[in-house]
Structures are given as structure tokens and as C-alpha cells.
Amino acid sequence: MSQTIRERTEQEEYSRLSPLAAKSAEAKRAREEKECQIRTKFQRDRDRILHSKPFRRLKHKTQVYIAPIGDHFRTRMTHSLEVAQICRTIGRGLRLNEDLIEAIALGHDVGHTPFGHVGEETLASIVGHFEHNEQSVRIFTVLTGNGKGMNLTEEVLDGILHHTGEGIPKTLEGQIVKIGDRIAYLCHDYDDALRAELLKIEDLPPVVKKVLGNTTSEMISTMVTDMIYSSMNSSYIRLSEEVAQAMDEFRHFMFERVYLSDTLKEERKKGKLIVEIL
């Protein structure tokens, strides 16, 4: 039989992608499978996640606002899609594996509880330990496929597990998602806060305006561009010192004025109570 489309794609990766990129042909699964003629392992992982029930359930899970009025506030699903797009752009700029990036980005938050992080914290206080990234891996390895999971590649599972916390993903693609996730949620939560009239543009710290910009579009563009040029030909993904400091200031501002604000305190109480009752 002549060369399959998958084999051609795998071959092209070695000539087209950076030497530092993860290669589909080298990806490992816990259980061996018959290869697809069309799709690489990472492409199949992405499709398995996208078509899964856990991913579809993300549309009912909110980010910050438990019961927002209107259709334009973000959910875990829209967040995951935004993370995927931001991170693919970065990956393309660095000639890394976009299929691996997309799979990690789409699957990174499926383990989240309802009601945002207050749901996660409440469940952890009840059962003793709960981390949404660990639950995401648990879903893909045990809680689907009649106990067999989806048999995703080690590279995808590693990126999902280490997208948050102190651990560093072993692939550059996973490292992109780790930072890209933060870029996405800070910017879209800021946008949602403006829509909810919790904030005004004038409230932004001066250093954030100066370095990152005033609008979500400007902020995303600044951080994505900086991340690409700061990480070029590097063995790890990073932001420049100036942009990283501005991002930290932006994050501190969002926690103080939005995530932990008195305005959302009642919503957090409601979410906590519902999880405790369940």
C-alpha cells in the first residue's frame, strides 16, 4: 500500500516543525491501537475530546458568574475554545505541534466542578482532596469508556495534568497551554467584568494599561506576541520580564476587584451551599 495521509503528515512534521516540537509519530499510549490512515495520534486525541460528553458538559459550567444574565458571559466551554485558539497561534509562531496544543487546551478543564473555583474548594474540603486538573486526567483515563478511559497519549495527559500548579509540562506544547490558559481567563474575565459593570477601563492599574493595553484584544495580542518572541529557539516557554510583571499585576488586580470581590461573595456562598447539599 502507498504512503497513508497520516504517514505523510508525520513525515512533514519532521521537516516543517521545530526540532523542539513534539512529533506525532513518537507519541505513546497506554494501550497500543491500530493507526488511523488519515489522522495522527494527537489529531485523534483532539477529536476524542471534542466529541466527548465531558467536553459537552462544559457549556453548563460557568467561569466566574454563577448565573449570569445574558448569553455573552463565558463558560468553561467558551474558555477552552479561547485557550485553544490563543495557544495555537503561539504554537504556530514557534513551529510547534498545533494538534497536541489543541488537544491539551480542549481537555484541560473538563474536571472542573460547577460554580467555578468555589465549587472545587468546597468539594476539596468535603472529600479531603480535589484538584480539577487531576480530575480531568481521571475522566480521560478511568471515568469514560466503561472504565477504560479514552486511551489518550501520554503527552496530552501530561499537558492536562500540569496546566496548573507547580509542575512543568514535559512538552513545549504543554507549557504554552499553561501560560495561554492564564492569558485567556484574565482577559475574558476582565471583559465579562466590564459587561457586568463590576469594572471600568479606568480602573486598570497604570502599568497594565501601559504594557498590555486597555482592551482584551490589545492585551491578548501583546502577550501572545511577547511570548512568541521571548520563547523563540528556547527550550522552555516564557514571557519577557516586563510583560510577565504586568501580567502578575493584572492577575492581582483581577483577584482583588473581581474574583474575591464583595459583589460576588453572595454568588460564591450560593455555590458553596449547593455543593455541600449535593
List the model feature ranges, each with a label:
Residues 102-107, 179-180:
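Short alpha-helix carrying the canonical HExxH Zn2+-binding catalytic motif
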Residues 92, 111-115, 124, 128, ...:
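Amphipathic alpha-helical interaction elements
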Residues 61, 112-119:
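Short, conserved acidic/polar surface loops in the N-terminal third of protein domains
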